[in-house]
Every structure is written in C-alpha cells, then in structure tokens.
Amino acid sequence: MPSVVVVGTQWGDEGKGKITDFLSSNAEVIARYQGGDNAGHTIVIDGKKFKLHLIPSGIFFPEKISVIGNGVVVNPKSLIEEIAYLAENGVSANSLRISDRAHVILPYHKKLDFLQEEAKGDKKIGTTIKGIGPAYMDKAARVGIRIADLLDKEIFEERLRTNLEVKNREFVKMYDSEPLEFEEIFEEYYEYGQQLKKYVTDTSVILNDALDAGKRVLFEGAQGVMLDIDQGTYPFVTSSNPVAGGVTIGSGVGPSKISKVVGVCKAYTSRVGDGPFPTELFDEVGHQIREVGHEYGTTTGRPRRVGWFDSVVMRHAKRVSGLTNLSLNSIDVLSGLETVKICVAYERSNGEQITHYPASLKELADCKPIYEELPGWSEDITSCRTLEELPEAARNYVRRVGELVGVRISTFSVGPGREQTNVLESVWGV
C-alpha cells in the first residue's frame, strides 16, 4: 500500500501543484486533505497554464480518482466554477470525489472573514477573505454545515436558519453591518449541493480500500508547514494543518498507511501576506527574484515577499512533518546572480546562535540570519535534465541544500513545465 504525502515546507507557493502533478503519473488516487480555495496551484501542461484552487492536480488524469477529503472546507460556488473552468478547457471532472464529511463555506463565513480582518486595523493577518478561518471556527464550535447536511434539504434549512440568526446578530451589533437574507442563501446553496451530489461519497472508504488493494495514493497538501496553525508562525498562519500529520485527520486514513513524505521547497523563499520572514530581501536582488520567478499569488494576485533559502525553516519542516524526501524547485530563478546565499542559523542580539525556529515572534524579531555565501552561475539551466548537466556552481548549491536540510533530494526543477522536473530518486520505487 504505497502512499506519498506532498507538503509545502515554507510559506506556501513552493510548487506543490507542479510536483503533485508530476508524481500523479505513477499514482492511482490523488487526495486533498486540508485548506480550501484560499490555496492556489498552477500546473503547466503542454505549455498551457491551469490554475486550480480546490480540485486536486490529479484531475488531469481521467483514469485516476481525485479526492477532496473531509479536512477540506469547500466553497460550493467556487468548486462548481472550477469544474466549469476545467470543462471549458476540455478536462472532465468525472473522476472527482468529495467527502460527505467536508465542511461548507457559506456567504456569512466570507463576510465575517472580511469584517474581522478590517477590525484588526494595522494588525491584519493578511487573510485571503475566502471565509476559511470562520468556516474552521464553526467546525470546531460544532455548528458547521457539512456536505452531507447541504444535500439534505430539511437539515440544511434548519441549520442555516439557526446559524444565520446568530451571524446576523453579530454583523449588526458588533460590526454595524447589514444582515444577510436567508432565502437567497438557502436557495442558491441548496442548488449548488444538488449539482455536486453526484461527486459526494465517503472518501475515507475510497482511500482505505485503494490502499488495502495495493494502489498508489498521493496526498496533496495546501499552503505550507510555516502556515500550519500549530507549527507555523502563529498567528500569521492558516486555520488548518498542512503538516503531514494533517493527512490522517483530513482524509480518514490512519498514520500506519503513510509510506513517504515529500517536502517541496523553492531554491529561495517567498511568502504572501504579513508575518515574520527572517531572510526577506528588500533590494534589487529581491526584485529580480520576484520578477524572474513571477512571484505573484495565484489566489490573490498580490506580489509575494521573497528572500534567500532558509535552512532553519527547512529543518523545522523536516522535523515536524517527518520529511523523507525533498523536491527542490525554481533553481533556474537564481541564474544570473553573482552570488547566492543560504541562511544556516540565526543570531540573537546578544551574539548567541540558534539553529531552531523560535515559537515566540518577539524572540524571532531579535534574530538575524547568518548566511553562507556560494558562487552564483550565469548559464541558462532550463534545459538541464540531469544533475551533471547543471553548471558546477548550481550543482554545488543543490548539494549544499540537501546537506543543510538533512533530507535526500528526489527531484529538482529548472522551470515550470513537467519536462523540467528531473528525478534523482523515485519516491514510488518504480
């Protein structure tokens, strides 16, 4: 029962969709286990870009099953739009399966997300205003509406009416905002549920049956370890658990059935929104990396903050997600730089060096990155297909990253295309 988990090891946008798409060729089932349509991944097939937010990357393989697990919060409207977008581009969603236990994002979640963020003033977290956080809040408070509830007209009506009464009081009294109308939401979202009904099932059964039958299952994470609500840069995090441990909760598959964990990272670092970022660059080098790497959010369109590769962050990701392999992306973006840097440790203001990532943001603010500087390379490496074809400086950079993180590099990428992802070691054993 081979199974592989793909996790982002930084602050998201590491190229998980690309690696998941690449690994999907040897998988038979591909599953999302957390997050919602706040995450975006771009996949390039035959030079054409596809941007997905909810549907797993495996949807491009019609013979494979694509699963949206119970740990995902689903915006039915967004999901239907994504299915239509794929259909317009000749991609069928017939192989899609949606967990009946997944929770639903409703208009009051998005409205509350916006109002809460606005109320924070200059202390905003940088949410995508997709309603993700409020949906997970309702789930934890045991008042959420699940896909199974959405499909049952009587249950959906009862729970929506109850929830909307509470939310509307909050909108009016706490935020001085207009209430939402019940009938409009009820009719619209019940119809969405009926459109999605043919995809809905108990996905835990599908996943476990597949694994028990010896089929290869790929679990696709959203965001990254540093955005994990427990292990990330709290409170500048998402509302779910992107770490590998989130798979068991968000898919209904036990931990004994997980074989390998592939951490995906870029050869540099990026993040969207507010929060600590020790190696962030504000100079011309940072601007060059952003423009060459097209570092703008798939979901928000916001320019991403960029910085040097941080091995302190990566070792944290290795530890809390149990990484067995590493996929190193976007090495080509660093081409043309005279020198490249890797953060190897942090230094406190008192001169003490630390090699772990602090939980306290105050402690983190007192730290400065300690860099190891390596020679850069000027060559265009986008057509390189083996490690040996890379210029010596690029080859040394890749090796040094593996040494500092302490994880075997199984693939390296020199561009966005499938053909630009190069295998050093198969995680499937094939």
Curated annotation (Swiss-Prot):
SMART domains, per the entry: Adenylsucc_synt (SM00788)
PROSITE patterns reported for this sequence: ADENYLOSUCCIN_SYN_1 (PS01266), ADENYLOSUCCIN_SYN_2 (PS00513)
Cofactors that this protein relies on: Mg(2+)
Reaction catalysis annotation: IMP + L-aspartate + GTP = N(6)-(1,2-dicarboxyethyl)-AMP + GDP + phosphate + 2 H(+)
Example GO molecular function: magnesium ion binding
EC number: 6.3.4.4
Binding site for substrate: 298-304
Signal peptide: none
Pathway: Purine metabolism; AMP biosynthesis via de novo pathway; AMP from IMP: step 1/2
Family note: Belongs to the adenylosuccinate synthetase family.
Protein name per the record: Adenylosuccinate synthetase
Provenance organism: Lactococcus lactis subsp. cremoris (strain SK11)
Gene name for this UniProt entry: purA
